[in-house]
Amino acid sequence: MDDKQPLTLAVGRIVRPHGVRGELVVEVRTDSPELRFAPGSVLGMRRRGAHASENFTVAAARPHAGRLLVRAEGVEGREAAEELRGALLTVTADELESTDDPDEFHDHQLEGLRVVFPAGEEAGVVAEVVHTPAGELLAVRTPDDREVLVPFVSEMVPEIDLEAGRIVVDPPEGLFDAEE
């Protein structure tokens, strides 16, 4: 018997309740929110500190201030919504659409990759891909355990080699310098 769990990927995080009817403010972590958060969509939900996932069925979703307001089936009222604060909303990796674009990546493909400067010296490891309204950032954990946020744009990230497990970054001067 195979006990291996499928790889799950976060497509959103519940930030907080909104209003008194149980709506949830969701920070989106997917390029396809209209697909992932369509009414009737069933996502996995892992509450803070929990190891097991439970089902989260979207009843409705609408954009709000760079995030989504989501109503979930079975979540009625602010108290029920408050219990979900901080939960991750997930899909399994096999639910993701493959892309034919060589410059398009899923977060899980980048997280854990070695980060090097153009001359080859180590810069760190990609700890997380951070999604913001202004664009994506690579959170790079440096060898001295600092976190540096690198804008995920071709000028600063000129090369990604998934097979070699490596990303080349060419940041502006001072970005990786330790604070004095």
Curated annotation (Swiss-Prot):
SUPFAM superfamilies: PRC-barrel domain (SSF50346), Translation proteins (SSF50447). Keywords: Chaperone, Cytoplasm, Ribosome biogenesis, rRNA processing. GO terms for biological process: ribosomal small subunit biogenesis; rRNA processing. GO terms for molecular function: ribosome binding. It comes from the Bacteria. GO terms for cellular component: cytoplasm; ribosome. Residues 102-175 form the PRC barrel domain. Its main location: cytoplasm. It is found in: Cytoplasm. An accessory protein needed during the final step in the assembly of 30S ribosomal subunit, possibly for assembly of the head region. Essential for efficient processing of 16S rRNA. May be needed both before and after RbfA during the maturation of 16S rRNA. It has affinity for free ribosomal 30S subunits but not for 70S ribosomes. The PRC barrel domain binds ribosomal protein uS19. Binds ribosomal protein uS19. Belongs to the RimM family. This is Ribosome maturation factor RimM. It comes from Saccharopolyspora erythraea (strain ATCC 11635 / DSM 40517 / JCM 4748 / NBRC 13426 / NCIMB 8594 / NRRL 2338).
